[in-house]
Amino acid sequence: MKRYENRSGHGGVTGYEILPDSIVLEFNDKDEYLYDYSKPGREQVEQMKILAERGEGLTTYVNQHVRDNYRKKLNKKASHF
């Protein structure tokens, strides 16, 4: 899991892990969510990967375009950081 830079200083995403056909996002509450090509879809996942690497706009994108359309909520974990 890599730390999300969050250049804007606002937002709920704290970390991410990019996989070939998916991305895992960690949020402020330490919950992790898997987004993949089947849900929410390839276009959204690829855009999320770009924003994650850029360190800006990911939380806004998730809130506006993805919301609860994730593949799976993963077990709550202790922070990776």
Descriptions of predicted regions:
Residues 1-81:
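A charge-rich, low-complexity, intrinsically flexible signal that marks solvent-exposed coils, linkers
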